Amino acid sequence: MSQLHRGMHKKPGMFPPKEVLEEVDAGSGSDTETEETVECTEEEEEQDETDGLGDLGMPPPKKTTKSAASPTVPAPALIPSLSHLIGLEGKQPSRKYAPAEWPQYFKQKISVARDNDTFNVLYTPPDDSEAPVYVFHHGAGSCAESFALLSVRLREMMHEERFQLAATAKIRDENKLPGMIAFDARGHGFTEVESTDYSLEAFTNDFAFIVANVVAEFGLTNNLILVGHSLGGAVVTNACHLKLIQHPVIGLAVLDVVEGTAIESLASMQQILNSRPKSFPTVEKGIEWTVQSHTIRNRESACVSVPPTLISQHDGPGMTWRTDLMLTKPYWKGWFTGLSEKFISCAPAKLLILAGTDRLDKDLMVGQMQGKYQLIVFQESGHFVQEDAPDKTALSLIDFWKRNDKVNKTVPLFGAFRA
């Protein structure tokens, strides 16, 4: 039997009154977080496909019609110069890249023990037994905090909606805010696992273990919605396909990963990983590089999701990547093989959110035409859709829950996104 240890930190009030959120139209562009999201030029957008450096499951870099050897048009750099970002004079970084911490986004931090392994879990309990619990799995090279901003947006928007309904006497209460479960996968963040097995099977068994133990520890009876980004999408899909979650699952949401393009991108992944800076003088410089390289476009999200992916160097000053993704290379193809077929065959309602329409493979195109899952496309988002566009992602997940939860009796206020 595993042991769960509750964190010492709790955050009591996360949802002060906010302005009424404007309805987001299906064809709208990026979120309205203009101060948090770094804008990019058309030239930079052409390189977006090579910017998802912290995760796998990306399409191959787009080809340019201009010669790299042209004396007048130099080849575009895959990564911004590290010396440019750090500054040759050693000037201090702007405080706008100051690291943020998990208590601003989750209410509890707990440890789930299994033999000699310890999993780091971030948890926010649901406010009502009828509210859903979203269970998140991050992608390769990322961490639980990749869903931090999304978690807050989900509860804020749900609170705002129920406040409006209560004000018009359409409901009797406003306490059905969703719960959140996010954790660091093996080899990532602050989770400590002895094994170096990074197969899909190992990740999937870990996921099922975490869900079972958190549900049991807190006595949750709520319906679950599984949400996975990139590699995490393959993990939650596999767990659902194998029926490893012994608790009601009403929804499966996969964020920006498609089997066909994921496997195609593997040929360029080593080049992309080798092109990343190997170290940073400070955590703030790591955040700055992540934002300026458009790996994550939302500065607020990067400030909380990047720090756990860095660790102090053993052989000198500065920070380096916590997860050595090259150690996972033997498992890359196995992560995504069969993903589309498994996703389409899963019993719960299914949602696929993509950053671009060109990423559907044949199986998914056929399944989408047959109405086997809901497809939403964020045209102006990068690979980390939950971080780049947390408002749109939250609205989509709320609408997805309301469409598929038999317990829910309210009509969504938010307009649905359409493919």
Curated annotation (Swiss-Prot):
Enzyme Commission number, as recorded: 3.1.1.89
Species whose genome carries this gene: Yarrowia lipolytica (strain CLIB 122 / E 150) (Yeast)
Keywords carried by this UniProt record: Hydrolase, Serine esterase
Family: Belongs to the AB hydrolase superfamily.
This protein's record includes keyword Glycosyltransferase: no
Biased composition (Basic residues): 1-12
SUPFAM superfamilies referenced in this protein's UniProt entry, alphabetically: alpha/beta-Hydrolases
Bias (Acidic residues) ranges: 32-52
Protein name, per record: Protein phosphatase methylesterase 1
Keyword Aminoacyl-tRNA synthetase: no
Domain of life from the UniProt record: Eukaryota
Any one GO cellular component localisation term in the record: mitochondrial small ribosomal subunit
Pfam hit, one: Abhydrolase_6
Chain segments carrying region Disordered: 1-75
The encoding gene: PPE1
Reactions the enzyme catalyzes: [phosphatase 2A protein]-C-terminal L-leucine methyl ester + H2O = [phosphatase 2A protein]-C-terminal L-leucine + methanol + H(+)
GO MF annotation terms: protein C-terminal methylesterase activity
Main function: Demethylates proteins that have been reversibly carboxymethylated. Demethylates the phosphatase PP2A catalytic subunit.
Active site residues of this protein: S230, D256, H383
